[in-house]
Amino acid sequence: SRPADPAGSERAARKDEHLELAVRLHGADRPSAFDDLAFVHHALPGIGTEAVDMSTTVCGARWDVPFYINAMTGGTRATAAVNADLAGAAADAGVAIACGSQHIALRDPERAEGFRVIRREAPRAFVLANVGPTLAPEQAVRAVEMIEADALQIHLNAAQELVMPEGDRDFRDWAERIAAIAAAVDVPVVVKEVGFGLSRRTITALERTGVGAVDVAGAGGTDFIAIENERRPRRDYSYLTGWGQSTALCLLEALGGEEPVGLPVLASGGVRNPLDVVRALALGASAVGASGHFLRTLVHDGADGLRR
C-alpha cells in the first residue's frame, strides 16, 4: 500500500481550515469601495430589457453572461462536496467556474477526485484550472488535463505566503515561471490575485509573459492574511488585515484614463450583489467573479439555497 504522506495530510487539514475560516471571517464589517460608486439615473431608458445582450468574450470563448464562480477550494472530502455543489449551481445557471489550487492533487493523485467532480457536475461549463506560479510547466499541464479545463488560472498570493508559517519566501522568478507555464499549456492563461489586487505595474509586467487575461481579485472580500493570521498561535499579523487595493481601485488604475492596459481584465474580490457586478462592468471589467458570497450561502442555506 502507498505510504502515508504527512505533508499531504497537513495540506489537506489546511484546506479544510481555510474553508472554515473563510466562512467565519467573510465580510467581517469591512467597508466596500464599490459603495463609493453611484450610477446616474436616467428616467427615459430608451430600451427594453429583451434587447439587452449580456454576453461577453473571455479567453476567446463566448459567455452568455459576464459572471463566474471564482476559485475556492478542493482536494479533501469536505471540499469535494463544496466543489460538487458549486459546479452543479454553475451548470444550472450557465456560468463559468474556477476550481481552487490543485497543488494538493498534483502531489497526491488520490485527491484529484475533489477537483474532477467540477467537470462531472458541469460538463458543458467553461471551467478554469488553478495552480500557483511555483509549479513546473508539466504540472500545470496535468492540472488542466485533470479537470478538462478550458483555461488555467495562475494565482498570485505573495502576501498570504508571508503570513503563512509554512509559506514561500522567495518570489524573484515568478514572472519567468508564469511565462514558462503559459508557453506549455494549450489553453488560455488568466493570472489572478487571491484578494489583494493587481496594480497597473503588475499587469503591465504580466503583458510580457504571454498570458491571455488578468483577474484583479482586489481587497474587500475573503482576506487570506486574516485567515492565515487566525492559524498562527499568537495572531501577530493582525495589523496587515485589509492589505491591498480594492477591486474598484484596481479597475480604475488599469482601465481608466486614455491608456488602458493591454490585457483583458476580469474583476473579483468583495463582490457582494448584482449591483457590484454592474459597477465592476461599468469600470471596464470583461466579466466579474465571486467566491466568498457563494461559499457562505452554500454553508448556511445548502445546495438548494445556492441554486436560488
Where do the PLM segments sit?
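Hydrophobic faces of well-ordered beta-strands that scaffold small-molecule active sites
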Residues: 67-70, 95-100, 127-131, 150, ...
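Non-catalytic positions within long, well-ordered alpha-helices that form the structural scaffold/packing
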Residues: 91, 144-145, 207, 281
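Glycine-rich phosphate/ribose-binding loops and adjacent secondary-structure elements
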Residues: 172-307
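A glycine-rich helix N-cap at a beta->alpha junction
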Residues: 120-139
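Active-site beta-loop-alpha junctions enriched in small/polar residues
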Residues: 72-74, 102-104, 130-134, 155-159, ...
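Active-site cofactor/substrate anionic-group-binding motifs, chiefly glycine-
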Residues: 58-105
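An N-cap/entry alpha-helix motif that binds or orients negatively charged groups
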Residues: 1-59, 63
